[in-house]
Amino acid sequence: MTMKKILFALLTGWMAISFTACDDFLTETPSTSVPTEEALVTTQDFQNALNGVYYTLGSYRFLGRDVLAIGDAPTDITSHSVATSHFYDIFRYQILDTNSYIEEIWAYGYWAIDRCARIIKEGASFKEVTKGDLAEVEGCIAQAYAIKALCSFYLTNMFGLPYSEANKTTLGIVNVTEPVPAYSQVSRVSVEQNYSLILDDITKAKEYYAKEGVENVGKQYMNTAAVAALEARVKLYMKNYEGAITAAQEAITLSGGTVVSTKEDYKNMYTTLAVSTEDIFFIAKAEDDYLSANALNTLWNKYGLSINSATVAEYSPNDIRLALLGGTWTGGKMRGITTNNQISNLPVFRLPEMYLIQAEAYAKQSTPDYGKAKEKLLEVAAKRNPDLDDNEIAEDQTVI
């Protein structure tokens, strides 16, 4: 065989090997195109999917900034310096359906809901291989139901009218009971139907948490106390006052926490990343997070929002909340931690809210119990303001 023929044979063989290898490479399934039924197979798959849900939930486009800011920006406690345009339209009640913050909340709320729906659907058919695997997946399902209810509640209240006899038949949001295929036609349902699904998801979250072997989770996750806290908030909005009182008490008991009563403890809730005795569920941040303009902390003060001086003047001189609200700092609680002023853990449910829910519910129920309402109010107010004279608080409709 001549040298030319030898080289030709070698080249042909090399090309055949190369094409085969290339063909194998090109037929790899992209990681972003794995079908859901193949993506959620092992317990680790479900944990990974749930981590993705929490990432979406804590994004600055949802509970990491927008949802929390949109409730405070247009209120009487807030001023805007126009240092930037951030939330300025919302501050002035010039809210269009093209507002970027509104669009972000809608998109990220539904992305979180969709991911929860996928965990729930695939988890229902999970087959246990190793003992304990099923309980781990059922724990993921419990959290998925709880987060789905939480997101649906926020979206319903932002894109629907407040729950009432007059409003409950008006359009709310799109109910999601299972993953929605791409390009499907969907429709909004009534506010009443939204609330019905929210309560159903809360019930299912409790049922899954009650299953054998399912463990509770920490306060940076939707734990059992957080599920009860959500139920209390939802039922208060629905004017189901007895249900709100019961659910709030369940959250108080399950949390095992206490309301802080010193300036140092109050300040530490917002200037450190330590878990507080008041926390029920919070969006956890890391010390090295770099959020810059997207931080809720940056929005308050540097990017325009501040607590107005008239609000601060309402506090008693010894009120422990002045540890954060007093002085030259005008950004309220959101001053950040000592080593990174862009971050703070962001509370979603806290113990004081549960006592205040009970106070409002006792005062507004069909047969008001103003004595109980005052008692629950003082669980928070007396600890915040050591100078408070509880004898000055009347046991009548003015208690709230």
Feature map (PLM): residue ranges:
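Bacterial Sec-dependent N-terminal signal peptides
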Residues: 1-32
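Inward-facing hydrophobic residues that define packing positions of alpha-helical scaffold repeats
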Residues: 50, 113-116, 153, 195, ...
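Membrane-proximal, proline-rich intrinsically disordered regions
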Residues: 22-70, 248, 374-378, 388-391
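Hydrophobic-face positions in mid-chain alpha helices that act as interaction patches
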Residues: 48, 78, 221, 239, ...
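Conserved, well-structured interaction surfaces
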Residues: 85-159, 189, 206-211, 243, ...
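Short coil/linker segments at helix-helix boundaries
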Residues: 132-138, 158-192, 196
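TPR-repeat structural position
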Residues: 195, 241, 368-370
